[in-house]
Amino acid sequence: RKYAAIGLALGAITTAFAAFDILMSLDPHWFSTIFGIYFFAGSFMIIMAVMALVSMMLQRKGMLTGLIKVDHYQDLGKFLFGFVVFWAYIGFSQYMLIWYGNLPEETVFYRHRLEHGWGTMSAILLIGHFIIPFIALVGRWAKRNLALFGFMCIYMLVMHWFDFYWIVAPVLHEHVAMSIYDVTGVIGLFGVYSAAFMYRLSRHALVPQRDPRLHKSLSFTNT
């Protein structure tokens, strides 16, 4: 608890710098000061989805039963929905600023993603990453229906991967192209992360110890 606030701030900063150093640097001539926030929004959206999926998985294994209720999943759904909207807002803000500035070294990013078949991929990203989850998660009932909510969490993981593909692939390929490595690379990294996560999870208490606010958090009723 002592380091949670500091860790959150450091996580936001390192996430933004990772976006600049790993993704934006693929095209050395293109730059966007808002790109770090764009990456941050997508990352925190996925944190909410993974948190919900892990909680569902643990409850299926007989753990956390009676502790995590549908009200908690509804709150995670609110955060997931909020970051879906925030991601779209930041994405549109970046596009609007580049369109308004109309500088060749900036517009090249979107020009590459509107030519040679990439325009279709851009439309799929807009519809699949924003419009569909916005409609699916806007209602209260959708966040309390665990089958639908779990499906949407998995769906957003896939769309987040597609967002990465949309950022990286046009720099490497003039025309739309997909390799088996685009999928297996993600699966490999996901496997390493899952193994490390489960290793840490097995050695720590699932429920915070001696937390004076724990009872209030577990017994609240959502609206």
Tell what function each PLM region has.
Residues 41-56, 128-133, 185-201:
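Hydrophobic cores of alpha-helical transmembrane segments in multi-pass inner/ER membrane proteins
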Residues 1-123:
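Long, contiguous internal "core" modules enriched in hydrophobic/ aromatic residues
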Residues 147-158:
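Central hydrophobic cores of alpha-helical transmembrane segments
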Residues 63, 67-71, 189-223:
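Extramembrane terminal tails and long inter-domain/linker segments of multi-pass membrane proteins
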